[in-house]
Regions:
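Conserved beta-strand signature within the Rossmann-like core of class I S-adenosyl-L-methionine
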Residues: 95-104
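Short "lid" loop at the C-terminus of a central beta-strand within the Rossmann-like core
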Residues: 54, 103-108, 124
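Short glycine/proline- and charge-enriched loop/turn segments
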Residues: 111-119
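A short SAM/SAH-binding and catalytic strip from SAM-dependent methyltransferases
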Residues: 68-81
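Short conserved AdoMet
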Residues: 20, 79, 93-94
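A short, conserved alpha-helix within the catalytic core of class I
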Residues: 78-88, 102
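Residue-level detector of anion-binding/catalytic polar loops
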Residues: 46, 97, 141
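Conserved N-terminal segment of class I S-adenosyl-L-methionine
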Residues: 1-68, 85, 101, 118-119, ...
Length: 155
């Protein structure tokens, strides 16, 4: 689906600029059809996939192994995002990138009218300030791309 590919490119294209070919990348929460993983493989990346429901192979959850980890439209579904964030950082090598895609809360007023919160599978929400706090807590640099992508860099 070309539209979904363009959607995923909002995360993939800026991440790809940071990665040499043949880097180890984990697509965490890839869902039943790992389109992003396929896109990354097509660009020469060494990609593993993990999804709690569709690709539950725990052997890919390796410490200090990945050059990049992607989590697209996932973190808002997690009941314990703090644990997931810590796991991602454990699996990420030094100088690795964690790319997260989720709509961000912009204000309390906007939240009240926000369609995104009405999806009952969305159980937690993040603002730019929250992501900045996470980056500072874990001594990460960060970059926001558009209104739904954050890339954290582990140094």
């Amino acid at each position: 689906d070309e539209g979904y590919k363009q959607f995923l490119n909002r995360l993939w294209l800026p991440l790809k600029e940071r990665l040499p070919v043949n880097q180890k990348v984990l697509d965490f929460g890839c869902g039943p059809g790992p389109l992003l993983a396929n896109m990354m493989q097509d660009e020469g990346m060494d990609v593993s996939v993990f999804d709690h429901f569709y690709h539950p192979d725990q052997s890919v959850l390796r410490a200090n192994y990945y050059d990049a980890i992607t989590a697209t439209e996932l973190i808002e579904h997690l009941h314990q995002p703090k644990q997931a964030f810590k796991l991602w950082l454990t699996m990420l090598k030094l100088n690795g990138d964690l790319a997260v895609m989720t709509k961000r809360v912009t204000s309390r007023e906007a939240f009240a009218k926000w369609h995104y919160k009405n999806d009952l599978t969305h159980v937690c929400f993040f603002s730019e300030a929250c992501f900045i706090w996470l980056a500072q807590m874990h001594q990460l640099s960060y970059e926001f791309i558009g209104n739904d992508v954050a890339i954290f860099h582990k140094t």
